[in-house]
């Protein structure tokens, strides 16, 4: 869990107070959890792709359905970092013993696909999901 202004904040998927997807798109939408991204990395095929001149990743499920995730990088202030890589926030806050609280994110870079921790001050993409 994550302590946010003295409030113990567990995973907040679907809570419009903290979940930008629910707040902006409505109650049917939410940010994916860390566990959902871990499942995506384990059971889907990911490959670099370009769609409408945008570099990113094609994610194909076991049933053959696929989505495209653009490689938008991150933003800090006015600086765009890691353009071409995909950083997708989860709704799962994490405590790193050495440096405080971070947000879990899915990182796609070339053929490297993993879950990592992202500083809260970095802007990363959000890929909303719905049931």
Question: What is the meaning of each model-derived region?
Answer:
Residues 1-131:
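Conserved positions within compact, well-structured domain cores
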């Amino acid at each position: 869990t994550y302590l946010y202004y003295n409030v113990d904040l567990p995973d907040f998927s679907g809570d419009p107070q903290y979940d930008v997807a629910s707040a902006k798109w409505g109650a049917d939408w939410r940010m994916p959890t860390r566990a959902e991204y871990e499942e995506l990395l384990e059971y889907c095929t990911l490959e670099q792709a370009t769609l409408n001149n945008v570099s990113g990743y094609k994610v194909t499920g076991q049933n053959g359905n696929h989505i495209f995730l653009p490689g938008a990088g991150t933003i800090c202030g006015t600086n765009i970092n890691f353009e071409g890589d995909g950083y997708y926030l989860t709704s799962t806050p994490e405590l790193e013993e050495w440096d405080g609280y971070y947000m879990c994110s899915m990182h796609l870079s070339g053929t490297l696909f993993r879950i990592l921790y992202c500083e809260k001050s970095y802007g990363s993409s959000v890929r909303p999901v719905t049931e």
